[in-house]
């Protein structure tokens, strides 16, 4: 008999829909209410023919995401092996020096980390036992599934790879370490999944390690990630004796046998020493679902035991609604539990017809349009990743609607260019398979087409566009100079890297004439410098890393500026009046923050309309280089209210110069300040080194915001100025005898201390005087 909870008796939640809404910003912005999603799902299904319905039911587009070193790429390697995609298993840092299939870059195999996201396609044949169980329960299922997988980096410096993968995927597997649990990048990935409304299942990996604690990890998912979670399995054995899992839904034992865990042995008998734990965790699963799903709540109130079919249905509904994540467990390295995750991907993650994707109709005032994954509808596809391949630029596409065929002409809605599809391929890491067509719901790649990441392609019959992904701002820069005089290869490399990676920026410093590259961290820039050497044979000298400071104002200041120049012939005359003030940043439809704006409040024609764009352009140009230390200005609103002009001497140039001078004068009177980037730093190390680590952080002016200590190790979360974090890699190694690790990501900008601002201003003024 099940124990009743007051919460379950009193809460009567409506049944959750099985449609995932992937709006161009959020559900609220699309005008589609969550309560109407079942109706929208019905509309999508009605527009699909029988062949499309069957085809789509067999497709899963998933990403595999995790904190660095959680075993994500090792897990993907097992998936490829068990699905028959590769013939043997190679480890990330294996002794055979082959490396994991999905880490195909030489640098990835040397460093043992994933740098670029890699795509592959595999087919999962359900186990005979699983097929029989589903048939017995009359579950709606398929015997084989086509799974498109994107393996993403775990390091925060390459977070854009996760962003663009999640933008086009329907579901995800979140891999967590059974020892470390929820870490800093886990929280970042969770935030990205929420941004793109991606349902996820969770896999607690490394259950074979000493100190593995899946229950702590599940508690952290509930509390730190704030998404209800419960185990659907418990482990059989611990550490090096791990041999399988107990399936809490079917109440049976699943063992991995064979030298590589390829043989599945299923027993209806749960090991005696685990029966009580299995009952306890199954009850916890049911109680959690009863709080989230009406059908299970009804069963719970009646004190009945739900059937496996009812449990699976509830898990699917709540997972698709992003109200719940089922937690599986095992060890990819020990070949335990991976096949169960593949079954869960098929059982609980959505197929393309269960995800509503929204486009904007450029021909109809950008009204939102719900796309239908029908092979017969007009083509709509999104370019989500660019890569330089052996045969030219490789463009990855997600097909949202229609069919893309080799030999067809397609239209780039963003550039209005017409392009012929000469080669169509399906990627398997860095290998390619030629294909003739890709239907809605599929992922493919094209060769030799000029486009940008985020461009939308159609067959020309519609003018739909899909918003691009969120692109974080770079936080670190350094100067770069080729050692040789071969600037052609240098320029080629920089142009290519900018096209491939929106977070990698290049600019020329007009004063020093240096090339400045900017990115998400030291490792990010280090990788590109090394790739330039290896792939383009260009050795570079690099300067000291620079922090991406910003400038802002702290009070509202009016301006009135007259630009007047008379030197014979045509003169220059322009007057602008208004004010500047501080503004908070607001998110746009793509999730990017807009923190500066120009507002025109001119009435009566005192500034003719033809000169307003020149004023606006001048303001945005001036923002690029501030007046305190030459860094970009943020959080600033420029309001133009009045002005004056001369019928002969006024021009766009005159109003441009007047605007820049007015802005400069007002900005310097508005109590300007320097902002410095604050990083969210996560550190894990053995407990005996905790004092030294905290002392070192204190010297770096860190603010510790959270800490967690286990028997053997501790984890700290701290907010630290990026300017204080240089050389920290060396320090943490020395402080912890090589046993500590850390990660950091940009958190926010805060005013720099006065002494830091004075140093920066003095250095900038000194440089200007040279």
From Swiss-Prot:
Coiled coil (UniProt feature): none
Any one Pfam family match given in the protein's UniProt record, by short name: EFG_III
GO biological-process terms attached to the record: mitochondrial translational elongation
Pathway as given in its UniProt record: Protein biosynthesis; polypeptide chain elongation
Residue ranges annotated for the tr-type G domain, each copy included: 57-353
GO terms assigned for molecular function: GTP binding; GTPase activity; translation elongation factor activity
Keyword list, A-Z: Elongation factor, GTP-binding, Mitochondrion, Nucleotide-binding, Protein biosynthesis, Transit peptide
Compartments where found: Mitochondrion
Transit peptide as recorded in UniProt: 1-24
SUPFAM superfamilies xref list: EF-G C-terminal domain-like, P-loop containing nucleoside triphosphate hydrolases, Ribosomal protein S5 domain 2-like, Translation proteins
One annotated Gene Ontology cellular component of this protein: mitochondrion
InterPro entries tied to this protein: EFG_II (IPR041095), EFG_III (IPR009022), EFG_III/V (IPR035647), EFG_IV (IPR047872), EFG_V (IPR035649), EFG_V-like (IPR000640), EFTu-like_2 (IPR004161), G_TR_CS (IPR031157)
Annotated binding of GTP, by residue: 66-73, 151-155, 205-208
Keyword flag Methyltransferase: no
Function comment: Mitochondrial GTPase that catalyzes the GTP-dependent ribosomal translocation step during translation elongation. During this step, the ribosome changes from the pre-translocational (PRE) to the post-translocational (POST) state as the newly formed A-site-bound peptidyl-tRNA and P-site-bound deacylated tRNA move to the P and E sites, respectively. Catalyzes the coordinated movement of the two tRNA molecules, the mRNA and conformational changes in the ribosome.
Similarity comment: family membership: Belongs to the TRAFAC class translation factor GTPase superfamily. Classic translation factor GTPase family. EF-G/EF-2 subfamily.
Protein name: Elongation factor G, mitochondrial
Organism: Schizosaccharomyces pombe (strain 972 / ATCC 24843) (Fission yeast)
Species lineage: Eukaryota, Fungi, Dikarya, Ascomycota, Taphrinomycotina
Gene symbol of the encoding locus: mef1
